[in-house]
Swiss-Prot record:
Gene: cct7
A molecular-function term among this protein's GO annotations: unfolded protein binding
Any one Gene Ontology cellular component term annotated for this protein: chaperonin-containing T-complex
InterPro entries cross-referenced by the UniProt entry: Chap_CCT_eta, Chaperone_TCP-1, Chaperonin_TCP-1_CS, Cpn60/GroEL/TCP-1, GroEL-like_apical_dom_sf, GROEL-like_equatorial_sf, TCP-1-like_intermed_sf, TCP-1_chaperonin
Protein's UniProt name: T-complex protein 1 subunit eta
Keywords associated with the record: ATP-binding, Chaperone, Cytoplasm, Nucleotide-binding
UniProt source species: Dictyostelium discoideum (Social amoeba)
GO biological process: protein folding
Family of the protein in this entry: Belongs to the TCP-1 chaperonin family.
Domain of life of the organism encoding this protein: Eukaryota
Phylogenetic lineage: Eukaryota, Amoebozoa, Evosea, Eumycetozoa, Dictyostelia
Function of the protein: Molecular chaperone; assists the folding of proteins upon ATP hydrolysis. Known to play a role, in vitro, in the folding of actin and tubulin.
Amino acid sequence: MSQMIRPPIVLLKEGTDTSQGLPQLISNINACCAIVDTVRTTLGPRGMDKLIYQSERQVTISNDGATVMKLLDIVHPAARTLVDIAKSQDSEVGDGTTSVVILAGEFLKAAKPFLEEGIHPQIIIRAFRSACELAKQKIQELSVDIKPENMREFLEKCASTSMNSKLIASHKQFFSKMVVDAVQLLDDNIDLDMIGIKKESGGGLGDSQFIAGAAFKRTFFYAGFEQQPKHIKNPKVLCLNIELELKAEKDNAEIRISDPTKYQSLVNAEWKLFFDKLEAIHASGVNVVLSKLAIGDLATQFFADKNMFCAGRVPDDDIRRVCRATGAAIQNTTSNIIPDVIGTCDLFEEVQVGGQRYNLFTGCTMTQTATIILRGGGEQFIDEAERSLHDSIMIVRRARKHRSVVAGGGAIEMEVSKYLRDYSLSIEGKKQLLINAFAKALEVIPRQIADNAGFDSTDILNQLRQKHAQGEKWFGVDIVNEGICDTYESAIWEPSLVKLNSIVAATEATCLILSVDETVQNNQAEQAQAGPQINNQTRQALSRGRGVQAMRGRG
């Protein structure tokens, strides 16, 4: 009896590409390591910047890990995991975005030889998670609680440390005080929306200003604006979301009249409605009127005659910050303006900053707010300074809440690495080797800081290992003297939350990538979305497990 040939079982649509097994896992690791190499040189006080060219008018210069990862527009599905953890670190803590990406890449690189030797990924995952828990416990044990009387100094040092690797590092003392002033003005909830950062080209970084209140750039104005008061004590502020302007209706406007003489009565009625709105605003007793929509020339002249200030087309975030700071509420009508919706503060004034005029509300009683006006030469430079200040504000915010600190400069990573190495000697089997590999991977932070500063990283690491073996737990890389030093005594401090979050996020990303053993790629879906296509040569390289490494040197 002849053997029947069974037809193959088709589970996926034609054109669907699948890659699975160890080669696919190694390919994902190679892709992630290639991404890590892109941001590796941005770490530390001597880290380099990246110039990302998107279009003729959109150029970004940054060494912020989250910004660089976001602008790279990575399409590899496994490598996008690193983008996600960088964004998570940025939103959760504000700093350490480059560190978390480098740590994840180093953990994957440490796992690669074990995979090639045939160790199951789940064994590696369990060992790495165990090492992560031990690292968390050690960091919490080493962290130093800050006393309330030293809180100001502590916050300034944390802000200064986060600026060490930024373009504004030369002005870190100036900006660290500014950042701490801004955060300490806020209430215990520390809502970052109450800190506004404005950018004004011209001058230098040292010309930047801190304002203990809400401020926004003067909006477009009409004739009569120059006659309005620009300095008002204890102002009464009304915020609107209506248009105070007479405009000629061109679309969807139709009037049907039987008698041409009635046309003037319609015009008079329109003017009466308009002036009724203005009179209602004046009758409410306010003397500062802000609106998200336009305030026309007629309304501007009316308010000037009544000795009132007005500003139209105020940006949404600015008018909301003014409302929260002064206690005002945005109104969509002028028919029912009650005292409860009117805000106040100690002083309203208009001041000159560079080539622009700014409207300032200071002495706000309802909710404290702050505004930082950044000055600088180039647009890209000011944008990077804004990102740097955002990171520093996030760090100070977290430090104020958690009030525990560890030494920076790679000191905490070296101490945790030593602890894990000692612990691995007390256990047996594969777990010992895996925890030891995890410990060695942590040393990438001080090693990369030294490399980026142009030091001999091998010599630096040997010195650090010797010091930590002698019980000097706070020794890290000394950028100033090209060696090592006690970074805690040198006031190079970082909130312990930054280090905890970095190691946990990097470990989870590593475990996620190690747990994926198959990739299914639907080419038809890609064509429908007009996404990037993968040619046959690239697909063959990925299926053989060589990934990105296989394509190097072919460009």
